[in-house]
Amino acid sequence: MKWKLAAMFLGVSLALAACGGGGDNAGEKNGGSNGGGDTAAAAEQIFKQNCASCHGQDLSGGVGPNLQKVGSKYSKDEIKNIIANGRGAMPAGIIKGEDADKVAEWLAAKK
């Protein structure tokens, strides 16, 4: 019984470590710009850098839920709130400010 509990704890710890702690450096990698005028491309890049490890490169899910049709369930403001405050195992504030707004808008369009 102790080994099952230890294995479960280790698995959950590894999953949470994979999802969090990326820092707020999405804009730093390209001189503070997230793709110029193309907001959708910039949002997708921010997502891939900060969220894809849990939600999948194609939004199909994994450790985190499937987001392929998240816009049919949540509005942009609701998605932005989830990004800011976290939900379930998702840590709060992985993406902040304008980057969070871009990603929320991009995800809200996924219907």
Swiss-Prot record:
Signal peptide: 1-18
Lipid-modified sites (S-diacylglycerol cysteine): C19
Transport among keywords: yes
A single GO molecular function term of this UniProt record: iron ion binding
Pfam families membership: Cytochrome_CBB3 (PF13442)
Binding site for heme c: C51, C54, H55, M90
Keyword S-adenosyl-L-methionine (UniProt): no
UniProt keywords, alphabetically: Cell membrane, Electron transport, Heme, Iron, Lipoprotein, Membrane, Metal-binding, Palmitate, Signal, Transport
Locations listed in the record: Cell membrane
Changes after translation: Binds 1 heme c group covalently per subunit.
Gene Ontology cellular component annotations, sorted alphabetically: plasma membrane
Residues with lipidation of kind N-palmitoyl cysteine: C19
PROSITE patterns in the record: CYTC, PROKAR_LIPOPROTEIN
Functional summary from the UniProt entry: Appears to mediate electron flow from the cytochrome b6f complex to an alternative terminal oxidase.
NCBIfam families: cytochro_C551
Name of the protein in question: Cytochrome c-551
Originating organism: Bacillus sp. (strain PS3)
Name of the gene: cccA
